[in-house]
Amino acid sequence: QLANGVWLAAQQPSWVLSAHQGRQRSKRSLPDAREQLIDLASGRYGSIVSIAYHFFHREFDKLDPSISVATENAVRRNILDPYLDPGQRRANWWLGLASRGSMLNNWTPWCNSDVILCFLLMEKDQERLDRAVAQSVQSMDLFLNYIQKDGACEEGPAYWGAAAGKVYDYLQILYDASDGAFSLFGNERIRKMGEFVSRSYIGNGYVVNFADAGARLNNPSELIWNYGHAVGSREMTDFALYCLA
């Protein structure tokens, strides 16, 4: 079934949600094969396909080598190439590289964390991999400087897992890939971004909600604990255990 799944994924013309296809130059909702965008869905889809390929491509080859070839081509077409294409920076606005000072949100860490995982698992060209990592660091630096010093998520506590939580995912991926040489877990703003999830909690499963975020805590306890452990926040690890109780 894994082979069936990645084969199906490789045949799809796009992994982008139709609601986001309007950013194509064609301004149409159907995917234009001449242009590939990256959004929340395609990045996530690409990372899942890349993980499946990484662990099972030898098994796929036993069935038919065409499965692995098609998977490699699909990830390159849908994720790797458009990420490195300077002409796509306006469409991939979440990079923050098309126009400096532009508003950023949780798309930036979410997409970057998924895309960089695709590169680490699928890109065989070291020069392209280096470019991708450097670009992702530049993009994430813009996002981190966009966040206020108190570390609050401006989209509300319910978005924490898809904002600060994705920052943690991104940093953990690069930490693991570099054997710990790349680490921002000692940064105070990174810690405060994590602790926002516990400091916005008011009891009985409720948070101080605002923007379009819901009033109920919906962030996974394991993510809170892992984040807290990485940044050395007893507040977060204790809160994660409290949420499990």
Predicted ranges, named:
Residues 12-24, 38:
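Short, flexible active-site-proximal loops enriched in glycine and acidic residues
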Residues 2-5, 21-23:
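"Short basic amphipathic alpha-helical interaction patches in structured regions
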Residues 8-13, 76-77, 137-149, 188-205:
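Short, mixed-charge aromatic SLiMs
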Residues 15, 88-89, 152, 180, ...:
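Intrinsically disordered or highly flexible coil/loop and linker segments, enriched in small
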Residues 29-156:
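Active-site lining segments of carbohydrate-active enzymes
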Residues 1, 7-16, 30-33, 44-65, ...:
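Well-ordered alpha-helical scaffold segments within catalytic/enzyme domains
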Residues 95, 162-245:
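Carbohydrate-active enzyme catalytic cores, enriched for enzymes
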Residues 2, 129, 133-136, 160, ...:
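Hydrophobic packing residues in well-ordered alpha-helices of helical domains and bundles
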